[in-house]
Amino acid sequence: GITQFDLANNYGPEPGSAEINFGRILKEDLGKYRDELIITTKAGYEMWDGPYGNWGSRKYLLASLDQSLKRMGLEYVDIFYHHRMDPETPLEETMGALASAVQSGKALYVGLSNYDGKTLSQAASILQEMHCPFVINQNRYSIFDRTVENNGLKKTAYRPLP
């Protein structure tokens, strides 16, 4: 059966609507299985207007996670991903926000999505120094795009069919 649910703060026809719908289904049908489920969410794309409604600042990531948890009716997610590299925010700030999510109990593990190999390696080192459980790398992967094979990390793919 299906045990992993991969969500993001901006998924759905309206940003956040996928999490709202998932939260309703979890409450009505799947709640008794919560301990058997892997629920993940991501933040990194635009959610609201203003300087902190996008990318990878500490303020944006932690506010987005709080909003995601509220929409889904959860106290924590199993994996919280940063959805894409941020060219403006220092990597240490972004990784620090992910580590804070784990330290606060709002995420059990962290993941990264859409990071290039060099930045991914740097981020993994920072997270390791912070003793933050970085467990997965989510990138595009297909027969035509195998660039993530060489990073030595566990991975999950999106768009496996071209």
List the predicted regions and their residue ranges.
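Short, acidic/polar
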Residues: 1, 55-72, 120-124
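N-terminal binding-site loop/beta-alpha segment at the start of enzyme catalytic domains
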Residues: 1-37, 103
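Conserved, mostly hydrophobic/aromatic
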Residues: 5, 22, 39, 68, ...
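Active-site beta-loop-alpha junctions enriched in small/polar residues
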Residues: 8-10, 42-46, 82-85, 112-118, ...
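Acidic (Asp/Glu)-rich catalytic clusters
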Residues: 25-38, 69-73, 100-102, 124-133
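Active-site mouth loops of central-metabolism enzymes
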Residues: 47-62, 83-89
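Beta/alpha (TIM)-barrel catalytic core signal, keyed to glycine-rich beta->alpha loops juxtaposed to Asp/Glu
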Residues: 89-162
